[in-house]
């Protein structure tokens, strides 16, 4: 008889008979390996739920036993054609989804090429033209009206200048000369304010 440090006996006490213990442990082993992947290929049933159909994206539709009975009653009718078509709703979505996915994949690999393709003149060009390409082409061909009014939004066209203020720092010729003067004036005023404040503070101290 093994004894624990606290004095309690450590002998295993079996309340259920061996057959019952085995029966209780069985569903644990039958469950899928991971709870987040109920569509694992081990079993199609997950603790009372049966997988009704599985998508090509592994989206699974579950149904309980009661729902399955209702569906069976709905499908069952005197016509033999309906009874023959019973298993088809379960198989169809899987097959259709897989075929559809493979077809799309084939079409994509054949026709859709978004990556760069080398051009004739040696430069690499894009397969799919961006929105700015038409603007650049019209500027090069000498049609500024098309270039401005085509791809640009209305908010930029309504203003006096088409270009944003951030571009002014790049265009040094067009930059206004008032800005440095303004900053100097502001700095001067700030210094005077600080000096006045310091003087008042020293006066109050003495």
From Swiss-Prot:
Gene Ontology biological process terms from the UniProt entry: cilium assembly; inflammatory response; Kupffer's vesicle development; negative regulation of cytokine production involved in inflammatory response; negative regulation of fibroblast migration; negative regulation of inflammatory response; negative regulation of macrophage chemotaxis; protein transport
Recite the UniProt keywords alphabetically. Answer: Cell projection, Cilium, Cilium biogenesis/degradation, Cytoplasm, Inflammatory response, Protein transport, Transport
Q: Which GO terms describe its cellular component?
A: ciliary transition zone; cytoplasm
Q: What happens when the gene is disrupted?
A: Morpholino knockdown increases the recruitment of macrophages in response to injury.
Q: InterPro entries this protein is in?
A: UNC119-bd (IPR029219)
Q: Where in the cell is it found?
A: Cytoplasm; Cell projection, Cilium
Q: What does this protein do?
A: May play a role in immune regulation through regulation of the macrophage function. Involved in the recruitment of macrophages in response to injury. May also play a role in trafficking of proteins via its interaction with unc119 family cargo adapters. May play a role in ciliary membrane localization. Regulates the macrophage function, by enhancing the resolution of inflammation and wound repair functions mediated by M2 macrophages. The regulation of macrophage function is, due at least in part, to the role of C5orf30 in regulating ability to inhibit glycolysis. Probably plays alaso a role in trafficking of proteins via its interaction with UNC119 and UNC119B cargo adapters: may help the release of UNC119 and UNC119B cargo or the recycling of UNC119 and UNC119B. May play a role in ciliary membrane localization via its interaction with UNC119B and protein transport into photoreceptor cells.
**Subunit structure comment from the entry:** Interacts with unc119 family proteins; interaction preferentially takes place when unc119 proteins are unliganded with myristoylated proteins.
Give the family per the record.
Belongs to the UNC119-binding protein family.
Q: Which PANTHER family match?
A: MACROPHAGE IMMUNOMETABOLISM REGULATOR (PTHR31224:SF2), UNC119-BINDING PROTEIN C5ORF30 (PTHR31224)
What name appears for this protein in its UniProt entry? Macrophage immunometabolism regulator
Q: Which organism is it from?
A: Danio rerio (Zebrafish)
The taxonomy runs: Eukaryota, Metazoa, Chordata, Craniata, Vertebrata
